[in-house]
Amino acid sequence: MADNFNFELVSPERLLLSEMVTEVVIPATEGEMTVMAHHAPTMTTIKPGIVSVRSGSGKKQDYVVFGGFADILPTGCTLLAESAVPVEELNKDELTRRIEAAKKELEDAVHHEHKSKLEHFILELTHLRGVVQQD
């Protein structure tokens, strides 16, 4: 049986989750990352995607996050999300609105670096929309 560790998912609006879990899969910028108890200390950035949380009872909860940071310690993990909602509460119109707003910002962008970041963000949001619509 896997050991439990404390996981907290925090957005600027509220604390979405704080409980003992067996594993958390996070959409790290460098790729999906599974965090379990006794994980090596790590800090990583988070891209838009799905955070999957598995409790000790085996219950799985999914959340949509729109970027942020994860602070991982052997005793726990805190994910500070720019924005996050339980996947069942995701308003798909809001996701489409975010994509359209990013496209508009891309049209007005002047600097190459800003354009590149926006293009990547749009790609991530579009992929996320496809993943969420499949579920």
Swiss-Prot record:
GO cellular component: plasma membrane; proton-transporting ATP synthase complex
TM helices/strands, residue ranges: none
Topology versus the membrane: Peripheral membrane protein
InterPro entries xrefs: ATP_synth_F1_dsu/esu, ATP_synth_F1_dsu/esu_N, ATPsynth_dsu/esu_N
Localization of this protein: Cell inner membrane
UniProt keyword annotation of 4Fe-4S present: no
GO molecular function terms noted in the UniProt entry: ATP binding; proton-transporting ATP synthase activity, rotational mechanism
Alphabetical keyword list: ATP synthesis, Cell inner membrane, Cell membrane, CF(1), Hydrogen ion transport, Ion transport, Membrane, Transport
Source domain of life: Bacteria
Name of one Pfam family that matches: ATP-synt_DE_N
Subunit composition and interactions: F-type ATPases have 2 components, CF(1) - the catalytic core - and CF(0) - the membrane proton channel. CF(1) has five subunits: alpha(3), beta(3), gamma(1), delta(1), epsilon(1). CF(0) has three main subunits: a, b and c.
Family per record: Belongs to the ATPase epsilon chain family.
Function according to Swiss-Prot or TrEMBL: Produces ATP from ADP in the presence of a proton gradient across the membrane.
Name the UniProt record assigns to this protein: ATP synthase epsilon chain
Organism: Rhizobium etli (strain CIAT 652)
Organism taxonomic ancestry: Bacteria, Pseudomonadati, Pseudomonadota, Alphaproteobacteria, Hyphomicrobiales
